[in-house]
């Protein structure tokens, strides 16, 4: 009987051998060289070959800019040479939907044209709806190894993580127990250049696939608008808020209406350990983000309320 460790040995040694003939010959050769002393019969070779087959990791890609967005298509093209990719994304832009999901309308799921060889589906729902639909309808036989969101047209640094549909995908994936990463570029242009991000995206994806992420932790990755980057900063979320958010206008018919506008105002512009600082100074910002939002510092202090109320 072939021992389990032989399967691992064969798997490592045959990673570059792709044809059936090569695999069969190598299986027999390894059986002899590792002390089994004879070639295996066809049934045993088939058993070993099945163990040797290395499946590509399966990655779900979504976003909040829509399945047609250049950022999503660029991300898929960065992955398909080493991963099986499935896309399920909104049929139009759904920026700012955060963790929203649909309860008052039926959802549609439509097959679209492949991107870089990856199958693409779109939905009329939110980014989170797309994740839920993908798990309900697209992964019946095999679960994804990783969930990715982006690449977003515009950054999602600092408090934007709470509003972001891009990170809504990531948080939903994390809630389901899957390693999840969001990618964003600080360039809202629909024709933004995503090529400088390629080596960093691929490296981060490979690291997460190999090492995993802690339970209930996902990653928020933001890139500055640049052709080259100074490096990577693993940092914390910047504190701040949006100001002057509502732009008031008057309709020709005489009533007022509003556009959401404004800008982000940092509460700690000089702090050098934040994503906001990293982006302003030309670094890729990686923020490990927790799902558990409990404030443990306050938990014990407020325990007294249990007796006082």
Locations of the language-model features?
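Cysteine-centered motifs
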Residues: 28-30, 39
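Short, Lys/Arg-enriched N-terminal segments with co-localized hydrophobic residues
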Residues: 38-51
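A cross-family phosphate/adenosyl-ligand binding-site feature
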Residues: 53-55, 59, 70-137, 141-142
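Conserved acidic residues
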Residues: 145-146
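Glycine/threonine-rich flexible loop motifs
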Residues: 155-164
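Glycine-rich phosphate/pyrophosphate-binding loops
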Residues: 174-196
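Electrostatically charged, flexible surface regions
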Residues: 195-309
